[in-house]
Amino acid sequence: KEKFKYKELIFMFQKELADRILSEESSKNYGRLSILSNWKFNIKKIIDINPNSFFPKPKVKSTLLSFVPKKDLFKFNNVENLEYVTRIFFNQKRKKIKKPLNILFSKEKNLINKLNLNLDLRPQNLSKETFFKITKEYENLV
């Protein structure tokens, strides 16, 4: 278990960025940021903040987010592997997942079968947990 020195972090983001952090699979905003930021934290929206709440008034809306460390964290040898795996998948997010899986597991085709994934899916259709499992399998090879 990882030890954190805090119970909760509160951050304010531009609303569009907060929407990307909070997005779930199959939504248009879902991507690397959603997966990477939700790996270590349970993230919840607290409130949207109107530009009229500030002086001078910004041209964008803001969102307050709560980040609570996860108690049961998916363990990686190196978080850079998760960054690499998500980059491979989301560089061509409109393509099917067969190509990035072949890039990651080119010498171990049986691992693709072991993951038991529908190869006709696109990266935005895979859950965060699926990306964590793919990364763990990738780490076992490198």
Language model region names:
Residues 1-123, 128, 139-142:
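Class I S-adenosyl-L-methionine
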Residues 131:
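Short, Lys/Arg-enriched alpha-helical microdomains
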Residues 134:
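Intrinsically disordered, Lys/Arg-rich low-complexity segments
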